[in-house]
Each structure stands twice: as C-alpha cells, then as structure tokens.
Design a protein with these regions (language model features):
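Short acidic/glycine- and proline-prone juxtamembrane loop motifs at membrane-interface regions
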Residues: 95, 138-152, 190
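Membrane-interface transmembrane helices that cradle and orient dolichyl/undecaprenyl
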Residues: 119-120, 124, 159-177, 184-185, ...
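Transmembrane-helix signature of polytopic, membrane-embedded enzymes
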Residues: 32, 113-135, 153-154
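Specific aromatic-rich, kink-prone transmembrane helix
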Residues: 151-169, 307-310
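Start-transfer (signal-anchor) and selected internal transmembrane alpha helices
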Residues: 1-41, 212-221
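Transmembrane-lumen/periplasm boundary regions of multi-pass, lipid-linked membrane glycan transferases
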Residues: 52-53, 59-66, 180-301, 305-306, ...
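Aromatic/acidic, Gly/Pro-rich catalytic loop(s) in extracytoplasmic/lumenal soluble domains
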Residues: 436-440, 455-459, 463-499
Length: 499
C-alpha cells in the first residue's frame, strides 16, 4: 500500500454531527423575529439612560477626566463623547456612542460565534445557543453600558472559538485571528485574559502530543503580559463589571445562572448531561465543561455565553434523540420554574404597585404577564412534545421580558434614577473637587461621577466634598438633599464637605 493511502485523515471537529434537513420558513421567521427583538432591546434608551452605578459610572468619569489616555477603551470613549454631545445637550446622548461600541462588540460576538461555533458543533447548535444567549436576562445588559465588558467578551469568545478551530479543527489560518482577539481581550481585561491564556499552558503540559496548543499558548500569554506591562492591570477604578483584580466569581456564577431562568429546564439538564458525558470522555462535554470552569475562575462573560450554548445543545437533543435520558429533568425543572415565576411575579407586582403606582404598575404587569405566559407555553410544549412551543416559549419569555422592561418599565425607573442632575441643580455651587466614592462600599454613588465631571468638578482620591447616601426616613428631604433610586431601592442623596 502506498504512503499516500496510509496517511491518516484529519479528525472531524467535535460533535459536528450531520446537519438536519433544510430549515423551514417558520424557523427562519422565528430566528429573524428574535433577532429583531434582541436588537430593539439593545438600542432602546441608550441616549436617555442615567449612567449605571459601578463600572459605567467610573468608566465614563475616567473618559471625561484627564487620565483617559492611560486606558485604551477610555481613550476611545473620550474621542466618541463629542459626537453624542452634538446631538443633544439636555439628555444623556453624550454617552450614546460609547454605549454603541458595546452594542457592536456584542453583535460581533454573536457573528463569530455563529460562524465558528457552527463549524465546531453544528449550525443548529450555534443558532439555538445564540437564541438562548439573547433570551438571557443579564447578558444583553453588557451591550447597553459604556464599559469594557462587551469588548472583553468579544476578545475571549474569539480566542476560544479560533483556538479550537486551530487545534481541534486543524485550521492553521486561525492563528492570526486568535492573536487579534487575544489583543482585544487583553486591552479590555488584561488579568482575566492572562488567566484564560494560562489554560492553554496547562493544555500544553497535559496534551502536548494530541493537539498543537503550544503556539497559541505562547501568543496569548505574551500578548497579555505585554499589555499588562504597558497599560497596567487597571484594577484601581473598576472599568469593567467582571474581570477585575478583586474576586467576583460568586457574583458571576449567581447572575450567570439567574439570568438563564427562562431556560431553567434546559440549563439544568445540560449541566447534568455535561457531567455524565464528561465521564465518558465525550469531546464536546470535555471542551465546554473545562471552558466553563476556566471562564468562571477568570471572571469572563464568556461563561454566560457557554451556559447558553449548553442550553441550546439540549434543545437540539431533546427533540432529536428518541432515548434522550434527561427528559424528566427538563420537565421537572420547567414546572418548578413556572410555579416560582408566578410567585416571584406576584411579589414583584405587589412591590411595584407601591413603588410605581398607576401607570408604572400596569407596565410592570405587562412585562410579568409576558414572561409567565410564554413560560407556560414552553412548559406545555415540553410535555406535549411540541418543538415550536417548547423552544419558542423559552426564548420569547426572556426576549420579551427584557424588551418590555426597557420599553415599558424603565421610563418610570429612569425618572428617579436621574438624581445626579437634580442634585447638581439644587446645589448651585461653584465647581470644586469631589472625592471618589469607595468602590466596595459606595459604588452606588458612582452614577453621579460623569455628571459632576461635565459640570466642571475635579475628581480625585481626596477632595473638598463627597457624595453621601442615606435611607429614606421621612416624607420630606432637607435642603440640598434629593430623593432617587440607584436601581430599584429609594435613597436620599446629598453633597457634604469632607471633614
């Protein structure tokens, strides 16, 4: 036999099963409709939102200050701020274009996930995974705020898919894209990116002969270390919600799983499936399972995207495999979620009736009703083996809840979140120096920092004045105090001299 005939064929990508028959027009319509709802939720209120507490408040204040050149995303925001200011000076349109950068990064993440994860795991799994990500209650939020989280997600997702195509898929052309995405991730969140790169170093040690991990490991570690040397860890001002130096692993785990409540049955069954098949050394489960652990420890938003991929995989298996073993898990969790959703919606509406009486309550009622009704349709579809009800109900429960929140409910929240402008208007004092709030204990006050910078105040570790937050204890506020909400809870805010 000739040497050419004895040559081994290239191994197929992991779990790249044969694609199903061509999709129906109903499925195409559902996908495009879901994409429209997702995009509408991303773009709504971008130009009228008060800066969010925490990372966005610090990031926008840094872009408006004198230290914007020390951090590349802040430099980009600094260059984009005048574009929004030229549109409208009376609203928050000045922050529109920095927020649109996050929106663009989130959309690019979806694009590369569809293209590259589809090659690895099948186009249908990629589609379902992205639909589950869009239905998440928290992941789309990072496309609406002017922080580096969405940029870090783009970099980390691009790194993950491209390195799998380079090593497992034997596509040598993906090394250059891998380096580009590693640079994007390192610029946004250098410490988190370095931790992800160290995962490749571990693979070099334990799988040096199976796949070519060495070159990507050298490239990613080198880029992350270079950015750390030039830019620094950027851990002092919390320019991103996740990926900072102090640990928020439990926060990421909690909100990552809480955001998948519309997909509860699929997520629980998916995790059970990962554990079972991981013990059998099934490649998809090993890759995704290891990536979930590493991205959680690295505090990367890629963790949320991978959870969505796991849920999407179960949606495919549930209706494709006749002997799908976790059918009872999906059904039980779906029923439990439906009961809990009704109880939570009732309590939320009761609280909403007190916080936002009248029209605000009716808006919240519409949002809660959409969530519960589509969750009910999903549960009926799961028990009745109706694929359109099961998948469509689960996806639309999350998508429409997020969309209704921004369109119907958020205007009532925003009316009280705009306390920084009211505080500046009430004080009417000559701009001075403002002491930065403590990130750990007073991050709620960071919403006001960009507005004080716009008013001519100087921000620093020390200052003549500081912001103060206190609970509401009386029906009226004293002179110089304003009432408002950080997000939901009502507080009293004022400006006091530093003692």
């Amino acid at each position: 036999m000739s040497r050419k005939k004895r040559r081994k064929s290239k191994p197929p990508p992991p779990s790249a099963a044969a694609e199903p028959a061509p999709v129906s027009s109903r499925w195409r319509f559902f996908v495009w409709m879901s994409a429209f709802f997702f995009l509408a939720a991303l773009l709504t209120r971008l130009d009228v939102m008060t800066a969010w507490p925490g990372s966005e408040g610090f990031a926008l204040a840094n872009a408006l200050g004198n230290d914007w050149g020390r951090y590349l995303p802040s430099a980009l925001n600094h260059a984009l701020l005048p574009l929004g200011l030229s549109i409208d000076t009376a609203t928050d349109a000045i922050f529109l274009f920095p927020r649109l950068v996050s929106t663009l990064c989130l959309l690019l993440t979806a694009f590369f996930t569809y293209r590259w994860a589809g090659r690895l795991f099948g186009r249908r799994v990629a589609e379902l995974g992205l639909l589950c990500a869009a239905a998440s209650l928290f992941l789309p939020f990072f496309g609406k705020v002017a922080t580096a989280d969405a940029l870090a997600l783009l970099g980390h997702a691009g790194m993950f898919w491209s390195v799998l195509l380079y090593t497992v898929g034997r596509d040598r052309k993906k090394l250059l894209p891998f380096g580009i995405f590693a640079l994007l991730g390192a610029v946004a969140a250098p410490v988190s990116t370095l931790l992800l790169a160290l995962m490749l170093v571990i693979l070099v040690v334990f799988q040096r002969e199976d796949y070519p991990w060495l070159t990507p490991a050298i490239v990613s570690v080198g880029i992350a270390c270079l950015v750390l040397l030039v830019q620094g860890p950027q851990g002092a001002n919390t320019y991103w919600y996740y990926g900072q130096e102090d640990s928020r692993v439990l926060d990421l785990l909690f909100y990552g799983l809480l955001g998948t409540l519309p997909l509860a049955g699929w997520v629980v069954a998916g995790i059970r499936d990962l554990v079972f098949k991981g013990k059998q050394l099934e490649q998809f489960s090993l890759i995704i399972g290891m990536a979930l652990v590493v991205t959680l420890l690295a505090q990367s938003l890629l963790f949320m995207l991978l959870i969505a991929i796991v849920a999407g995989k179960q949606m495919q298996l549930y209706f494709r495999e006749a002997n799908y073993p976790w059918r009872d898990w999906v059904k039980s969790c779906s029923v439990l979620h439906l009961v809990l959703a009704f109880a939570v919606a009732f309590l939320a509406l009761a609280g909403g009736a007190l916080a936002f009486p009248g029209a605000g309550f009716r808006a919240a009622l519409g949002m809660a009703a959409a969530y519960w009704i589509f969750s009910l349709l999903a549960t009926l579809g799961i028990f009745g083996e109706r694929r359109d009800f099961a998948i469509g109900g689960s996806i639309l429960a999350g998508l429409l809840t997020v969309l209704f929140f921004w369109v119907q409910v958020y205007p009532y929240v925003e009316a009280e979140r705009a306390w920084p402008r009211r505080l500046l208007a009430r004080e009417s004092m000559i701009p001075s120096t403002l002491q930065l709030p403590d990130e750990a204990d007073e991050s709620e006050l960071s919403s006001a920092l960009p507005y004080f910078s716009l008013a001519g105040w100087k921000l620093g570790e020390t200052g003549n004045y500081r912001l103060r937050l206190s609970p509401v204890t009386a029906d009226s506020t004293q002179a110089g105090e304003v009432r408002g909400r950080v997000i939901l809870r009502q507080h009293v805010f004022d400006l006091v001299p530093v003692e």
